[in-house]
């Protein structure tokens, strides 16, 4: 049930991202040009034990990153993450 909830949440996020108006995309375009190809963002999941994201995606002791490109050596693709209205790969070690 938790996995289903996570998948539905990711689907809704993807649909919302694609439903943005062209004006919103035009405003965001200059910011996206400044993003470097090798930039990564550290994702930390806080909150109560047993949250849907912690149970479905992140196990204790794992470090996850929101990657623009492919996962680096030693990481595996675990899911998707969003940043500035775009969907990226969630890579965990």
UniProtKB/Swiss-Prot annotation:
It comes from the Eukaryota. Expressed in neutrophils (at protein level). Highest expression in bone marrow and to a much lesser extent in small intestine. Pfam families: Defensin_1, Defensin_propep. InterPro entries: Alpha-defensin, Alpha-defensin_C, Alpha-defensin_N, Beta/alpha-defensin_C. Residues 20-62 form a propeptide. GO terms for cellular component: azurophil granule; extracellular space. This is Defensin alpha 4. Disulfide bonds join 64-92, 66-81, 71-91. Keywords: Antibiotic, Antimicrobial, Defensin, Disulfide bond, Fungicide, Secreted, Signal. GO terms for molecular function: protein homodimerization activity. Residues 1-19 form the signal peptide. It is found in: Secreted. Host-defense peptide that has antimicrobial activity against Gram-positive and Gram-negative bacteria and fungi (in vitro). Exhibits activity against E.coli, A.calcoaceticus, S,aureus and C.albicans. Belongs to the alpha-defensin family. One of its GO terms (biological process) is innate immune response. It comes from Rattus norvegicus.
């Amino acid at each position: 049930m938790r996995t289903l909830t996570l998948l539905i949440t990711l689907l809704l996020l993807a649909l919302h991202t694609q439903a943005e108006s062209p004006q919103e995309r035009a405003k965001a375009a200059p910011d996206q040009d400044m993003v470097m190809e090798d930039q990564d963002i550290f994702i930390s999941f806080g909150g109560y034990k047993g949250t849907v994201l912690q149970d479905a995606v992140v196990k204790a002791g794992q470090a996850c990153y929101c990657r623009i490109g492919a996962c680096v050596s030693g990481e595996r693709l675990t899911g998707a993450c969003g940043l500035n209205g775009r969907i990226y790969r969630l890579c965990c070690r």
